[in-house]
């Protein structure tokens, strides 16, 4: 979509006129200040289901002022039988929002950006890690095996910049950019933090 109300309305009108209607299924939604972040399944005019993360910023009048998103095709269950959207739960630990945001910020710096990889085990509870990435199995071992497999193919997953870290309770969404296999890539990672440890992960 282009910037501005008219560009957005024009795009919506185009979708509305398509022979096959667009469907939207919201999976989960969270709030952080003037921003709302959501996980949603779209099917634009019958083109196939896509899993998305959307971020909306609202202005002082409660109107949508800005939007970011990232989408990927809906895939089959991963090696642990999990999907990109399952395991919904109500948000918890609202009093720990800022502490959980800090856990994820530190994890991004130390692990995902590779500044202190030796700290990786300390971010998990005895290696337990529920994984919804389409190609990675559960556990810290599953993550390590997937990264090793990519390395053998000469593919690097690099995080260069973290743009936003949004949080509500135990749910934290990070918006980052870098490269995957040398190609510029946007990373949207949703983590659930439990007792100060990274417990679960969804991404696009």
Locations of the language-model features?
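C-terminal and inter-domain tail/linker signature
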Residues: 1-204
């Amino acid at each position: 979509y282009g910037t501005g109300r008219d560009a957005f309305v024009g795009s919506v009108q185009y979708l509305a006129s398509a022979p096959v209607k667009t469907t939207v299924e919201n999976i989960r939604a969270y709030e952080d200040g003037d921003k709302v972040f959501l996980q949603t399944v779209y099917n634009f005019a019958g083109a196939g289901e896509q899993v998305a993360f959307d971020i909306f910023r609202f202005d002082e009048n409660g109107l949508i002022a800005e939007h970011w998103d990232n989408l990927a095709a809906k895939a089959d269950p991963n090696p642990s039988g999990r999907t990109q959207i399952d395991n919904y739960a109500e948000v918890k630990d609202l009093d720990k929002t800022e502490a959980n945001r800090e856990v994820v910020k530190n994890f991004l710096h130390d692990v995902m950006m590779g500044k202190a990889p030796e700290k990786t085990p300390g971010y998990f509870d005895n290696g337990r890690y529920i994984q919804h990435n389409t190609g990675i199995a559960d556990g810290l071992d599953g993550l390590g095996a997937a990264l090793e497999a990519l390395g053998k193919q000469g593919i690097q997953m690099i995080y260069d910049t973290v743009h936003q870290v949004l949080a509500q309770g135990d749910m934290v969404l990070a918006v980052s950019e870098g490269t995957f296999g040398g190609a510029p890539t946007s990373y949207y990672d949703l983590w659930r933090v439990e007792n100060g440890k990274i417990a679960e992960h969804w991404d696009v």
